[in-house]
Amino acid sequence: KEVPSKDLGMMAMAYGHVYVASVAFGDNDSQTVRAFLEAESYEGPSFNIAYSHCIAHGYNLADGLDHQKMAVECGAWPLYRFDPRRTAMGENPLKLDSRAPKISFEEYALSETRFRMLMKTNPERSKRLLEEAQRVVQAKYDMYQQLANLHYGSDADQETN
């Protein structure tokens, strides 16, 4: 695609009172379980966004968990939990659970037929889109990291005075 996809998690977080998590049990099963337990215990609306492999991605579904891991490792699928209850405790509601990208988006993308098809039919466009996707993925991770590092509570109050 020529434009980045919508960030449904960020849209839900903007409401401020919705529990939101992004999970991929193929990368971090304990984070997935923790997110589901937190969402279950939350009194308000909760929204868990789970990476799901699909036959249309063009790989053996027996390798689905490995592809989930690659999606997280390249930054295309950041893992996080946004729990509004943390603000009442003076804590940042956003916890970024994934690490900084350690493989390229291209490495992840070219492991799936849905992306390789464009490389075969239109290599120039594919190269351009892969480069742009890498920039978008890195910018998205950087934004989540900045938001997760914001200070809340009494420390934040003192910094603004």
Where are these regions (language model features)?
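Glycine-rich ThDP/TPP pyrophosphate-binding loop and its adjacent helix/strand module
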Residues: K1-A100
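Conserved acidic/glycine
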Residues: L65-N161
